[in-house]
Amino acid sequence: MNEFRFESVNKLLEESFRKNWDRLALSNYQGVSLCYRDVARRIEKLHIAFEKCFLHKGDKVAICARNQVNWAVSFLATMTYGAVPVPILHEFKPGNIHYLVNHSEAKVLFVDDVIWEGLSADEMPGLFAVVRINTFQLLYSKVPRITEAREHMNEYFGKRHPNSFEPEDLNYYKDSPNELAMINYTSGTSGFSKGVMIPYRALCSNIQFAKHVLPELNNQTNVVAMLPSAHMYGMMFEFLFEMTIGAHVHFLTRVPSPKIIMQALAEVKPNIIIAVPLIIEKVYKSKIQKIVEKGSVKTLLKVPVIDKMIQKKICGELVSAFGGNFVEVIMGGAAFNKEIEKFFWDIAFPYTVGYGMTECAPIITYAHYDDKRLYSCGKAALNISIRIDSPDPEKIEGEIQTYGPNIALGYYKNEEATKDLFTEDGWLRTGDMGIIDKDGYLYIRGRYKCMFLGPNGQNIYPEELESVINSFAYVVDSLVIEDNGGLTALVYPDYHQGELDGMNREDLEKTLTSQLPEINREIPNYAKIKKIEFMPEDFERTPKKSIKRYLYQRNK
């Protein structure tokens, strides 16, 4: 592990804003664009409003909205003021949003109109202001001085900067290593959100990591932000890091369907692509799978020399479809389907799979695509150490544990969960099981909490079985559950594609059911799937597209 040297995150932002004053900073895809000077101006006005409202350093400010430029402005204004941003995923239900605003003790809420329609100020008595994020107009104010501050904000700004607002006027709050930077509520598959207390050292360490492994990125860089900015993965590597290097972030403000994503990538031509595996898997199934499974192509892919020519052509077309200008595609947030990964590996597509969690803000392991190994999620990231709680870490899986400046302070107002998060010697328990090879590459087996026990005590990780099932044509996604002593696969089929190929729902389900013996041939005897059940619609998911497993569990 390298020696970690802390740098103030807010001062890094201040320096970047000064250097890139006239460069583009934030855009809504096919919408408004702001230069760094525009962002700084909006931040300054919000700082003045915060002062007039007597918002103190360390006070909490909740932000609940879709990705957009003013989400970024609200977040940056809060943090550079010295207050604590509390990003809340816009897909949460109103009751959950009420709870998180109250639990975090937020004083101010930035929210968009659609979400606010389902909320009630009476259910959030600690708030003294609710702000419409699109326009920064007040939706609710508890005291007159807040209304006055909003009405006269431009006047106050003019008095503070009577001549002009210049880069040298910036003076952002100087943070310290163990100071609370933000509270980020998890959206995990267990159904209970915990407020992860992220310190500034964790943000700094992740920024240093990104600069170290991607030195090609700079103030000429374009990025398409398709992941929720309220989620740590998207926030850090599609937004916050980019702001410290003067890059240009393009927010997808609509639901990021594969069609919209591919359109945006083709137009923006980003220099780096950050994604969850499900997005890449959908692209593979819609654009590539049917081609490579054609009899003639399958045959040619087995012929030496010709196979490399075909693979090179497919890789070239895929790179072009993703904009043709990127260093690599970095995937994280969930397991990558093994069959699809093998295909990407064979065609030499520039991808890599990293590993992290909210509690590490988020990075734990990574390897550049030139240095990666098949099915591994890389080696310990800059400033980080990892270990496996196992008598033989190379052969016997154990819990993955990590240590370094990335790790969280704990869970907000939850001492019991915080205590469970750390080992006696201070390492963070990830709850994930894996092995590590002699060269330090990590291979994840699955979540400890999701693991089943086989008939003779064997460890069965449903994620590994689901990877096999998901590799079959017409399977969008699957979930393996324990069901009265056996294993049942819940499968969500691609009914739309089946229809295009001339199959109704019944025919498609029969086709998939007939493949159960083939599925079972690819998995160990002690983990055989007993039956398949079909989901009429997609699974309920977290914003990072993981299935909410707890909703589908049955009697064991």
Q: Model-flagged regions — what are they?
A:
Residues 5, 14, 22-68, 72-76, ...:
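Conserved AMP-binding/adenylate-forming core of the ANL superfamily
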Residues 271-274, 284-372:
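Gly/Ser/Thr-rich phosphate-binding loop
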Residues 452, 477, 482-488, 516-556:
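Conserved C-terminal "lid"/linker of ANL adenylate-forming enzymes
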Residues 21-22, 150-185, 192, 216-222:
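Conserved pre-ATP/AMP-binding loop-to-beta segment of ANL
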Residues 387, 394-454:
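Conserved ATP-binding/catalytic segment of the ANL
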Residues 204-222, 229-316, 325:
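Conserved AMP-binding/adenylation subdomain of ANL enzymes
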Residues 53, 80, 84-158, 485:
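Structural core segment of the AMP-binding/adenylate-forming
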Residues 35-37, 173, 181-207:
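Conserved AMP-binding A3 loop
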